[in-house]
Amino acid sequence: MRHLTPQHLWILLASTLLAAPPPARAKFLLATTPANSSDVIRSAYPLGNGRLGFLAHGAPFVEVLTLNVDSLWSGGLFEVANYTGGNPSASVAGSLEGGRSWVFENGTGNVTGLLGDDRFYGSYRVLGNLSISVPEQQRGGKTEAAGYRRMLDLASGVLTTTFSADGRDVETSAFCSYPDQVCVYAIRSEALPALEIRLGNELVGSMLQNVTCFDGNGYGNETAHVRLRGVTQLGPPEGMRYDAIARIVSGSSVQTSCTNSTGTLNIVPGNGTTSIAIVVGAGTNYDAKKGTAEFGYSFRGEDPGPAVEANTRAAAAKTLENLLKSHIEDFLSLTGCFSLSLPDPLNSAETPTSELIARYNAKDTTGDPYLENLLFDYANYLFISASRPGSLPPNLQGRWSEGLGAAWSGDYHANINLQMNHWTADQTGLTDLQSPLWNYMADNWVPRGQETARLLYGAPGWVVHNEMNIFGHTGMKSGASWANYAAAAAWMMQHVFDHWEYSQDAVWLQKQGYPMLKGVAEFWLSQLQVDEFSKDGSLVVNPCNSPEHGPTTFGCAHFQQLVYQVFEAVLSVETAGGEADGEFVTNVTSSLARLDKGFHIGDWGQIKEWKLPDSFGYDFTNDTHRHLSELVGWYPGYSLSSFMGGYSNSTIQDAVAQKLYSRGEGNAEDANAGWAKVWRSACWARLNNTERAHFELRYAIDTNFADNGFSMYSGTNTPFQIDANYGIGGAVLSMLIVDLPTAFRDNSTRTVILGPAIPAAWGGGDVKGLALRGGGFVDFEWNDEGTVTKAELKNRSTSLRIVNKDGLLLAEV
């Protein structure tokens, strides 16, 4: 665990809550103007502890904290009695035989008989707003302030705001504590004003929510608080219940009263009182462990009220200093695991983040290394804030939403987005924070996914498709081009395999990882078909749709590459996973030998997206579709780059490059999205093409990042979609290292390449604590040209070679 530095001891030891000046490393988001409450998602700084999220915005003396809870959703069995997770009431697997025959005879077909029901899918939604206002300032119309400064410390997870008004200096701080499972707000001033605290949601009607206030006077040790309780619908059935309490920390010396008509808690500081702190807790009656047939797939748990009451009481009984100390120690133990240090040639460290983003120009080949470093650190910060043991994994908006209906439901899209959210965790010391992902798949996907496999495909094992909520929606939705995506679980098994490779956690593998992997392999063993179109004897997927692109057909490269990886993973870990079924292993081995590996070169030298002949007209030049589905085995996967030897094979490299050039820069009319650009950046990095990798990284920053560093889907226009925030970290790591697994038959010493695509603009940088497959870490640094010159291998026991991009041996075990 990293010790508290002098730059953080101010919070714990000094009487002020002011932050120290930022260090040279890129660890702060900085603003000199308030976050705009009319444009929250592009200006507010986010806080989170995995389960809870805050978005802080509002003018001085009118601060607002928008509150999210990971499990607060509309839809599912909470809102309709016959919700089926998109599954049919009876098997439709009989339609597959005729559909497959048609596809093999004609090249394309349809999956109409498998399409499902989208109704009552639901959406992630905001809980409400906590507002902290100063009535005397509002009555006088005085909300302007001098010297305004807000700063989000990415190392400690603390947001501080400072300003002066009417002769008083005011400091506020906010953080979301994982150890205490609350978010905390504090205000300090030598002339502390009276406050009004409200908790509510103006988007929700009064019939669905109840706001109460308790002044804490004369009722034992119960502290003053405001409370918001609600349901997503009255019913029947009754919708999801939610409960939130904002409670004054007991050490605050104040007088309190309630304005019951508005549910407002009025706080008047006592003589000599210079600070007031408030803890906020929230929960729902969602229970992930009740998503099985035994519980009718209900996911309905106990009323959240008692737990929220107990949790906020316990937190409010502590001092602000103790709350802050435990939070910072916890946060630093995670952010201190890994560091990337890039130069700051433009002296950007003291420039507001919005200005850095506004002036950033992708055409400037030097970019701004400080901002690029900052956004990398932000990726890790956002993951720590949105993914903690006991929470759900980050969704399309991470943990931060401001409405009742999020874009794309704020769900789990699993044809690039959910995967991209987890690109950096294994390598940056955050691999243990992926437990929400494993539990979500085990609790939410597997139980009903087994039903989907049986009803749609007549198959063993389990399967899900492209879009999943938190209510076990594992069936197809209603549009084949995006819903016919049975490869989602196969792709997620790459993350299962990677977690094993980096963590070497055999207990987890046997208990959770391998059973999921085996179930996916069993499904695909039952579904592969002998290719009757090409008549080459290979095994292919039929039917398939390349994600969101092209026809329903057979042998989609994306599917074939992912099934290839699933089978390789099974054979690599079956012993460690405790496999006892020799027949299963034999079937995987024989199917892998016959499997079409998803690599074919087309008429114009490209890797083909479909096995169909190019004469069908689907794989054409300058098709700038947002997805790079046929390159999944290049990056982030490795069936092409490693198992087929692509990283050192010019034929594969040329076909990948040809497709990347044709697919464009990620700015097509269908989606000018940041995630499309950073995926391209990572693919170019794996080709050792520094110029293109850095350009796509710069282009994403220039085009898709808002003032608060959040990535937007269409240029800088909403909606907010967090995947590029996480994906930018993956792109940077791809420029720093090539650490590929080997096929299960390969017993040679593995080689890791450091600095495959480090731009000269990053010259003189270094990395500390980069995790490696098979265990251990590496620290390294590079010269002004971007060539790694020094590396130190730590905690590594098995054989490994570390080289730079020129092949120079840097370290060896």
Regions found by a protein language model. Give the residues of each.
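Well-ordered alpha-helical segments within folded domains of soluble proteins
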Residues: 415-426, 485-497, 559-568, 627-638, ...
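Fungal secretory targeting signals
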Residues: 1-21
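C-terminal catalytic domain of Rieske-type non-heme iron oxygenases
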Residues: 397-398, 402-403, 539-541, 659-728, ...
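Aromatic-residue-lined binding/catalytic grooves and analogous aromatic/hydrophobic interfacial grooves
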Residues: 21-480, 498-500, 518-521, 560, ...
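Acidic/histidine-rich catalytic neighborhood
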Residues: 519-573
